[in-house]
Amino acid sequence: MAVVRTINGDVSPDTLGVVNAHDHLIRVGAGEVYIDPDHLLDDVDKAAREATYFVEASKSWAAGGTIIDMCPASSGRGVLKTLQVVEKVPGLQVVQATGFHQQKVYLEWRQSWVNQYTVTQIADLLIADIVEGIDRFDYMGPIVERTNVKAGVIKWATAYGKITEWEKKSGQAVAIASKETGCPINTHVTAGTCGPEQARFLVDQGVDPV
C-alpha cells in the first residue's frame, strides 16, 4: 500500500488534502541565505501564520492541507523548528525533502561533501534521511545526530541551461536513494531550463518514470 512520509510519520495519500508541491516553511541558514538574506526563514510563529492561511484556504476543498518543504540537505533545513510549525497549525501536514539544490547554492562546492564523497556514500546519507531520520545539523558536519523526522521526498536541482558535473554526481546519488527506498523525486529547474534533460538523466539512471 502506498504511503506518504510526513515529518510526523507515514500517512495514507487520501489524507493529504490540498497539496502545495513546492514551498519553504523554514530555512535557518546555508548558501541561499548568504546569497540573499531575504531567504532566511527561521521564525516559527511567522511560518505558522503563513501555513495557517494555506490550511484555511484548503478547507474549501478538503479538511486540511499538506506542504512539501523542498529545502534539501545542507541547505538550511531546520526540522525541529518545522515540527513546531506543524504543532501550531491544526490540519497541516508537512513532507520534508532530502537531496540537493543546484551547485551554486553550495558556496564552497569544491570542498563540499558531494565533491569529496563517493556516489554510494552520498546516496547512503540520503537513504539515512529517509529511513532513519534527518540530521538535526543538516549535514553541516562533522557530527551527525539523527532526529525522528524522516524525509519523504528527494529533491534534485540543476543549473541554468545545463547540468553541471557536480549536479550529475548528486543526481546519481538521488537516483540510487530513490530506487533503494521507493521515495519519489521532485526536481527543481532554473528559469525553466533542463526539465527534459533532468527526466532523461534520471531515467538513464534507472529511475521509474511512472
Indicate where each model-derived feature is located.
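Alpha-helical scaffold segments that flank or form the walls of functional sites
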Residues: L16-V28, Y34-Q93, T118-V149
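Active-site gating/metal-coordination segments in enzymes
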Residues: Q84, K88, Q93-P184
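Short secondary-structure boundary/capping elements
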Residues: D42-R49, I163-S170, C194
